[in-house]
Amino acid sequence: MKPLDLNFICQALHLPMPSENAEVQRIVTDSRDIQSGDVFFALAGERFDAHDFVADVLAKGALAAVVSREDCAALPRALSVADALQALQTLAQAWRENVNPFV
């Protein structure tokens, strides 16, 4: 199975391709759990809005952050979408179709 990479994410989310492709280690939604090579999805919850932590996540080595708040869209390595939760669901569906699991 081909590993997940930034090009796949951008293609699935109908975003411009990054200037450099890279293999994605993990998809993460908790900013406290970020590691180098991860892609962070900034989800807004009832108590916290993960967009408040995007700059920290990128500083910790995230490959990219998928964001839906305008003030985060200009950050380096930010992938701007209309709705980060919907983008995560779209990516999950695209990955499942790519893997073609036997159920």
Residue ranges and their predicted role:
Residues Q93-V103:
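Walker A (P-loop) phosphate-binding motif
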Residues M1-T90, A94:
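N-terminal leader/targeting and accessory segments in enzymes
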